[in-house]
Design a protein with these regions (language model features):
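Nucleotide-activated donor-binding/catalytic signature segment of Leloir-type glycosyltransferases, i.e.
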Residues: 156-161, 325-344
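Catalytic binding pocket for nucleotide-activated donors in carbohydrate/polymer assembly enzymes
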Residues: 360-436
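Acidic donor-binding loop of glycosyltransferase active sites
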Residues: 183-187, 352-365, 377
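Conserved catalytic-core segment of nucleotide-activated headgroup transferases in glycan assembly
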Residues: 118-127, 242-336
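A short, active-site helix/loop in glycosyltransferases that binds the activated sugar's phosphate group
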Residues: 53-69, 226-251, 326
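C-terminal amphipathic helix plus adjacent low-complexity
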Residues: 7-13, 18, 26-42, 421-548
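Conserved active-site histidine-acidic residue motif and adjacent donor-binding/catalytic loop
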Residues: 166-174, 321-325, 338-350, 364-365
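N-terminal subdomain of nucleotide-sugar transferases
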Residues: 2-159, 309, 526-548
């Protein structure tokens, strides 16, 4: 079962998806180039973000754009960025703390209360407060940080700032971010979204503290390769893409940092709360709904329904998806022994009662898998040998054969785990020890020290990008998967997300166009231009005087 078994017509269709996405990306990137040629650098940066946002959600067959990277590097050296700041009320932090500690500036786009990306930052901070001071700048953050993240930052002696609360102008944000780096940081860690252009504009000149790109979105297109002195890749399959397809000069593995989990509550108590019989074998899976979408011969729902139907003592708990559609149908087929619970924050009760963890496919969920594996649960998943970046999760788990290569192997191994208690306990213990060795201190710290040792003393822009990889099954798989899970993600959606960042006059033009094509309220909210409206009137008035 793999993409190689698809018919040639299916493969041709996936290649057409790549070409379709690439054409639309190129049109958006050209608009950024046109804006640069017209001298409107603010508009150029926004259109670069729009193009990157579209490519992030509708894979175009490549992971980096030399055209956009070069454009953003030219903006980085323009007077609009290199000039002095004209924000007299801005207080650039100056470090006055423990000078024996290295200062790390974490640049994020946004922080989230759920999801592994933000937790990675928090755990990295908490693991290293003995030798690092950590601060955060958010390029699009407007709401407060999750309390556990803000607490980690301040406990280390650091601070946090949100650029949207200072200015709506992306060029000014880039200048401010550059000043934060020069005035405070010893090292910069990038955790930004794939479409965030600010790091490239801010750090697109030689000199200053080195820049580390934490590659948390290693399977999709992204900006920033030209300003990364070192890539910190979370897994080997992502590292392979960074080296061949992103032009990474140096890539080092940095496993996702974890913390020692609390002791498990006796499973009898957890099962009692969930009204589950103590003799049942509990299967658990946790992931976003889209990761279970059937594609390319990989059908999680059909596969696990067959397992639960075969083994009457098995109950599957599904956390993430809603109880609807195929999930609801599957539950009915096995008389309710598949329980679909939606999104939940109280994950511990499910960890405590589970016997076996089923990783999602065709799109695996690394953070969830590591969290449960660290608790001693045996993990099983289905590997995609043709498009490994979506299922080959972690350098610590491969040799333990947690992820098998065929549906038949999956059914056999999972069946044995359900029927053989000692076997699953042995597998769980093996899984836990492997994860502990790389994801907890002191083992994890060995990787971090290797990453830090690879950083140069001074930042140097990576130009030109050296790309050697070609389009492969990873690309076609993602293109087809996007077509199912991101079918509604159009050019208009990407424009609508970023239009408020454009200069006022251009926003007005888009609004008029949008009223005919898309919902104008999404394209240009009123609050997006009220702040610039008075300045626009003044400029128009002065321009009219000049014509008289």
């Amino acid at each position: 079962m793999s993409l190689s078994t698809d018919s040639s017509s299916d493969h041709d269709r996936l290649v057409e998806h790549l070409a379709w996405a690439a054409d639309r990306f190129n049109a958006l990137a050209s608009r950024a180039g046109d804006a640069e040629q017209a001298g409107d650098l603010r508009s150029a940066v926004v259109w670069a973000q729009i193009a990157a946002d579209f490519a992030w959600h509708r894979h175009p067959g490549f992971y980096v754009s030399p055209f956009l990277e070069s454009l953003l590097l030219r903006v980085a050296t323009s007077p609009e960025i290199t000039g002095s700041l004209c924000l007299p009320d801005l207080k650039i932090p100056v470090f006055d703390g423990d000078h024996s500690k290295t200062r790390i500036l974490h640049v994020i786009t946004k922080a989230y209360a759920t999801g592994g990306h933000t937790r990675l930052i928090e755990r990295l901070i908490n693991n290293t407060t003995d030798r690092y001071v950590h601060s955060i700048v958010g390029t699009e953050q407007e709401s407060p940080l999750p309390p556990w993240l803000s607490s980690a930052v301040t406990s280390s002696g650091g601070w946090y700032k949100f650029l949207p609360l200072i200015t709506t102008n992306l060029l000014k944000r880039a200048r401010i971010l550059r000043q934060f780096r020069y005035n405070w940081a010893d090292i910069v860690f990038l955790h930004t979204h794939p479409s965030d252009a600010l790091p490239t504009v801010s750090f697109g000149i030689d000199g200053g503290p080195p820049v580390l790109l934490v590659n948390h979105a290693d399977h999709v297109f992204g900006l920033g390769s030209t300003v990364a002195d070192v890539f910190a890749d979370l897994r080997l399959s992502g590292q392979a893409v960074s080296r061949a397809r992103r032009g990474a000069r140096i890539s080092k593995i940095l496993p996702i940092p974890l913390i020692e989990p609390p002791n498990r509550t006796p499973d009898s108590l957890a099962r009692e709360k969930l009204h589950i019989d103590r003799d049942s074998v509990i299967l658990l899976t946790i992931a976003s709904s889209y990761k279970y979408t059937a594609f390319g011969g990989y059908d999680f729902i059909a596969t696990v329904t067959e397992v639960v139907a075969r083994h009457k003592q098995a109950i599957l708990l599904v956390v993430g998806p809603k109880a609807q559609g195929r999930w609801l149908e599957a539950s009915r087929r096995v008389e309710g022994r598949i329980r679909v619970l939606g999104r939940r924050n109280d994950l511990r009760i499910f960890h405590d009662c589970a016997d076996i963890y089923l990783d999602s496919f065709p799109f695996a969920s690394l953070t969830s898998m590591l969290d449960v594996g660290l608790r001693g649960l045996p993990v099983i998943g289905l590997r995609n040998p043709d498009a490994p970046i979506y299922t080959d999760l972690d350098l610590t788990l491969g040799p333990s054969q947690t992820h098998v290569g065929s549906r038949d192997e999956y059914l056999t191994l999972l069946g044995k785990m359900i029927e053989d208690e000692k076997f699953r306990h042995d597998k769980g213990r093996e899984c836990r020890e492997r994860i502990r060795g790389s994801h907890l201190v002191p083992g994890w710290d060995v990787y971090l020290r290797g990453v830090m040792a690879a950083l140069p003393k001074s930042h140097r822009v990576n130009r030109p990008l050296k790309l050697c990889g070609k389009t492969d099954a990873n690309d076609t798989f993602l293109a087809g998967f996007n077509d199912l899970t991101e079918a509604g993600y159009s050019v208009d959606v990407s424009i609508g997300k970023h239009a408020r960042l454009l200069p006022f006059a251009e926003r007005g033009q888009l609004l008029l166009q949008g009223l005919r094509k898309v919902d104008g309220r999404k394209l240009l909210p009123l609050k997006a231009y009220l702040g610039e409206f008075p300045r626009f009137l003044v400029k128009s008035f002065l321009a009219s005087l000049g014509k008289k």
